[in-house]
Amino acid sequence: MNNLLIGFLAITLLGTSVLAGRSPQSRDVPTPRAMVHKDNAEADNGAGPNSSVRVTEQKSVGEVPVLISRPGVVNRNTRLVVLYHGFGPPQNPRALAEALRLQEMNAILAFVNLPMVADRMPAGGRDELLRVQKEDFVNGFFFRSISGATAELQQIVKELNATYHLDADKGIGLFGFSAGGAAALLALLESDVPITAAVIVNAPMSVMQNVENWQRTLKHQFEWDNASRKAASRYDVELQADKIAERKILPALLIVQGDADKQLGIEPARRAFEALKQRYVGRGEAERIQFEVIHGLAHNFGPGSGATGSAQASIDLEIEQKTKHWFERFLCRGSS
């Protein structure tokens, strides 16, 4: 989920690169077609022969940078999907937009910049980021980022709903990768925003799981305090499955995990899924939850992940297709 640079030692934690003083768009990540400057817009015909013209816009919602990809014509059936990148490739909104092309959906795609990273690096840059990661990985960095994203979600949805004249009361879609997946899951646990469908890729299922990975990587014992224990009690999908299953709108939830993800492994995600599935079955909604293992998928994906070749391209396409099909099935049905 992030590369921690402690002193001169590079420590890889969940496969991520967090470097202050560096452009939030990696030189290895190509800019998506029709990427434009803040508050400007431009048509994008590049999605393929079956896609309608789309517009890409860079906006700020409050202080939150949001990259928008929307249909040229927004109608009453157009849905909103909020997408969160990870701390590593795809590690910012632009990289995620390049990795996950969903242009044929009748949906406004809002790629949101997570707190603490990319264009939202804290004052003090790399030194400050390293300090908070080292001194308090949970409330200084990881949980601070995902809980901040969850707290911002309602206002983001409200403003985009008003700007594009949407009907978000029917429910939105959420996508999250890695830390962004944790942010999306925390929203399912805590946010009042109506969420109809969600896709989670390679996400830690609890604060504890991420701390254990931090300890393995740094070979250092994390020092728990009351604040970090409280954070751990707020984010544990397996133990809090009832909260998701009791939502007024039961979210159609697809959990995707790579079998080559050495940082997270498969079992925590599988256990969380089984706990959730039991509740979904109890509500007679078993078809609204699914667990998919992608063979060969390591932690990161997309341009800039370091993986190359036809096998990786096939994996990236599989993530894109699973995401598209899930949203089309449960969010955008009959919306064209």
Which ranges hold each PLM region?
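The feature captures the conserved acid-bearing segment of alpha/beta-hydrolase catalytic domains
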Residues: 208-284
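N-terminal cap/lid segment of alpha/beta-hydrolase-fold proteins
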Residues: 27-76
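Conserved alpha/beta-hydrolase "nucleophile elbow" surrounding the catalytic nucleophile
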Residues: 85, 175-178, 258
